Amino acid sequence: MEAADVIEIIKALDEAGVVVWLDGGWAVDAVLEVQTRKHDDLDIVLADVEGLLAALAPKGFAVVDGKLHTNFVLGDAGGRRIDAHVVNFDDAGNGIFQMLGGGEWVFPAAGFESIGTVAGQRVRCLTPEVQMQCHANGYEWTQTDFQDMRALRDRFGVELPEAYR
């Protein structure tokens, strides 16, 4: 996934009134305001699944994997992938994510307040603190995860989880 692809996708969603926040590697690069590595996909957090599907279908995107109510992947014929994480916002603005194995993950409302840049364009993204929290739970880190999380620590002073110090 190239920076131009990210901007094309975000622009299409903005024009359709679909609000998304970057997550994953592109969110790290967005808050750092520089692309630090290649990206296989675009991770997003959103509430409006139907709007997402309607906005991106004309661009050739369709669901290729996952469950629409929680986490799914959109793909196109060019091999671009969007990993969508669906939240429902509570009255306090927290994003409630239904985990596939049961249970809920709560994205705190303050975690949706970050703005970063991709290819000079302003984009919504999860805050560095919430990005670190997301990486702290649920899976073993790859070398790329270490690189991303260390970059957040070095730039923003966000503490690495104890298991990864």
Question: What annotation goes with each model-predicted range?
Answer:
Residues 1-165:
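Compositionally biased terminal segments of proteins
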